[in-house]
Swiss-Prot record:
Catalytic activity: tRNA(Pro) + L-proline + ATP = L-prolyl-tRNA(Pro) + AMP + diphosphate
Domain of life: Bacteria
Family to which this protein belongs: Belongs to the class-II aminoacyl-tRNA synthetase family. ProS type 3 subfamily.
Name of this chain's protein: Proline--tRNA ligase
SMART domains per UniProt: ProRS-C_1 (SM00946)
Cited CDD domains: ProRS_anticodon_zinc, ProRS_core_arch_euk
The protein's enzyme class: ligase
PROSITE patterns named in the record: AA_TRNA_LIGASE_II (PS50862)
EC number(s) reported in the record: 6.1.1.15
Gene Ontology CC annotation, any one: aminoacyl-tRNA synthetase multienzyme complex
Gene label: proS
Length: 492
């Protein structure tokens, strides 16, 4: 097959867009700003879901489901949250259509079917969930309340890109209620760490843990914790957020509990989420000019086996050997695909599975059967080797672990060599437009400076790293005193 992929150095954005479509991950739909996630792309998302869901349950959370629609009066109860999302909301105003008498066979909105109160299509679910929690929480015995929801949300984006920014996207959102401030802060930090663990151990993406500035904070939160990743083009991508909500939503929706002394108090809240944006992060962190590169821990197919034969008799002999190998690999929980299609030649299959990022490819022909060997190819570095049949199972198992580690190490090296300390604004601009990546710089702590830097350079403060050390310095832009460095970058 012909890939005809634009290279990353030619046009990184075009390379990404082409890869998503050609690797059969997703495509644009007939609805502006919305995507169709195709089976192969959805299989990767399912792997992500499965691991995250396990991690949530291991930390005591349960899944539930809440309505897609939120009455406008309920949505606006927490003012900062409503104001923050207002411009992105899709709004339902009518509840039915009718036949259009002036245009036979066509429909129109029935003007007599106007809703008494508009319904907001959820951009996030704090309002509907906290209004429900009011009925669930009465006593300290009902706490903590640890709930997660897998859902779709709608944010009316004008400039969309597959996986990275779409009007409708899939995500999970956790919403928890606690008896004390300390418990809620601990939960917020715990879930940030869960996300970081998932990103590093499953996605093979190193992340910086930190918290957002007040300007970048989630609308309605007292603090937003985040994990930030760096893509191959030197732009950052926010890979997960966890919000300490204080008592803001509890007060807006009057969620109170009787403490051990019988006194009424408002609960403390958190919310946290990751979305199908993670698919974009996965693609952009590891993939190359040949196509997708998937870390084994999230690859729907970890090993593909391609037979090389000229006769049906040869194919039958190869298939017998492959069936034996496949059974042994599957016992080790390794996902295997035997591509015995007779409609395509081996070269086409090699190119197709390379494009789709399958971590390990095994080729076997009549000579391999004679010699008791298999040809094994790695997708990440495109290397090949011949492995004895008696060693193949252990070799493949070890190889998958090695590829997972190597992908993380490669991404970590790139990330670490693209964190640059700067001490003046000229240097800041030079690094931003040249090398790119994270820029570690002093900031005076004001929203005005943050906004001016963004206007002039398009760079935002990605986070204040949790491990940032106290260091006296002067703001890179204003020269005012600063106590620590923050990370700036251009971002998706």
């Amino acid at each position: 097959m012909s890939k005809n992929l634009t290279t990353r150095s030619e046009d990184y954005s075009k390379w990404y867009n082409e890869l998503v479509v050609k690797a059969d991950l997703a495509e644009n739909s007939g609805v502006r700003g919305c995507m169709v996630i195709k089976p192969y792309g959805y299989a990767i998302w399912e792997k992500m879901q499965a691991e995250l869901d396990r991690m949530f349950k291991e930390t005591g959370h349960q899944n539930a489901y809440f309505p897609l629609f939120v009455p406008k009066s309920m949505f606006e109860a927490e003012e900062k949250n409503a104001e923050g999302f207002a411009k992105e909301c899709a709004v339902v105003t009518h509840y039915r259509l009718k036949n259009d008498e002036d245009r036979p066979g066509k429909l129109m909105v029935d003007p007599n079917a106007k809703l008494e109160e508009e319904l907001i299509v959820r951009p996030t679910s704090e309002a509907i969930i906290w209004s429900t929690y009011k009925g669930w929480v009465q006593s300290y015995r009902d706490l903590p309340l640890l709930i997660n929801q897998w859902a779709n949300v709608v944010r009316w984006e004008m400039r969309t890109r597959l996986f990275l920014r779409t009007a409708e996207f899939l995500w999970q959102e956790g919403h928890t209620a606690h008896a004390t401030k300390d418990e809620a802060i601990e939960e917020s930090e715990k879930m940030m760490n869960v996300y970081a663990d998932f990103a590093e151990n499953f996605m093979a993406i190193p992340v910086v843990k930190g918290f957002k500035t007040e300007t970048e904070r989630f609308a309605g939160a007292d603090e937003t914790y985040c994990i930030e990743a760096l893509m191959q083009d030197g732009k950052a991508l926010q890979a997960g957020t966890s919000h300490f909500l204080g008592q803001n939503f509890a007060k807006a929706f009057d969620v109170k509990f009787a403490n051990a002394e019988g006194k009424q108090e408002h609960v403390w809240g958190t919310s946290w989420g990751v979305s199908t944006r993670l698919m974009g992060a996965l693609i952009m962190t590891h993939s190359d000019d040949q196509g997708l590169v998937l870390p084994p821990n999230l690859a729907p197919i970890q090993v593909v086996i391609v037979p090389i034969h000229k006769t049906d008799e040869q194919l039958a002999q190869i298939t017998a050997a492959v069936n034996e190998l496949t059974a042994k690999l599957r016992k080790l929980k390794i996902s295997v695909k035997y591509d015995d299609r007779t409609t395509q030649k081996p070269g086409f299959k090699f190119a197709e599975w390379e494009l789709k990022g399958v971590p390990v490819r095994i080729a076997v022909g009549p000579k391999d059967l004679e010699n008791g060997t298999f040809e094994v190819a790695r997708r990440d570095n495109l290397s090949k080797e011949v492995v004895a049949a008696e060693k193949i199972v252990d070799h493949v198992n070890d190889l998958l672990e090695q590829i997972q580690k190597d992908l993380f190490d490669k991404a970590l090296t790139y990330r670490n060599t693209h964190i640059t300390e700067v001490n003046n604004f000229e240097e800041f601009k030079e690094v931003l437009e040249g090398k790119g990546g994270f820029i570690s710089a002093h900031w005076d702590g004001t929203a005005a400076t943050e906004e001016k830097i963004k206007d002039l350079t398009k760079a935002t403060i990605r986070c204040i790293p949790l491990d940032a050390v106290e260091e006296a310095g002067t703001c890179v832009f204003t020269g005012e005193p600063s106590s620590k460095r923050v990370l700036f970058a251009k971002a998706y």
